[in-house]
Amino acid sequence: TFTVRVTSSTRTDTYSSIAAGIGSLKGPLHGGANIKVINMFHHLKEQIRDWKNVKELDVYLTRMLNKEAYDKTGLIYGIGHAVYTLSDPRAVELKRLAGELAKEKGREDEYEFLKLIEQEGIKCLQEHRGGSKPACANLDFYSGFIYEMIGLPQEIYTPIFAMARIVGWTAHRIEELNFEGRRIIRPAYKNILGELEYTPLDER
């Protein structure tokens, strides 16, 4: 959304602005996060021998947080949100829908395992942080599982996300174009390091 507003502030065309928004949404920390979650889920299904063994799962999730397992990023994908901390209402509803669909598709064991990953992932993350900040599952935690159950390929996960946002992006763009000030959005930067001594190129 912010990317659409920034590009719109330059008075570029709608196509370019929406394309920029899609490019921003595509990142694995945003719209592409549900792909990260479902890939992590498949990895955990292979690594954890007993899907009901809480201790075995906790050990592996802790190794992930310590950058010793899976992709070694120190992340449990789908856990945590910048705004929602106690619960993400979108994730709560998707969790319910995922349960109904899993029952219909005969994938209840996987659903129960995913719920356990959510439960223990939150616990392990809080312990890893020293218990200072609450966390919850976000929108991406169950959406990828739902998409997979209805047969959608990963390549269209992000486009579906973008489709749901196009109306909002368009509203933001219209608002941006109608500001009387016609200002370009640019970052503000304040140097807090003080002056540094310049080293000539040939001395570096």
What are these regions (language model features)?
Residues T1-R204:
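Non-transmembrane, aqueous-exposed alpha-helical and coiled segments at domain scale
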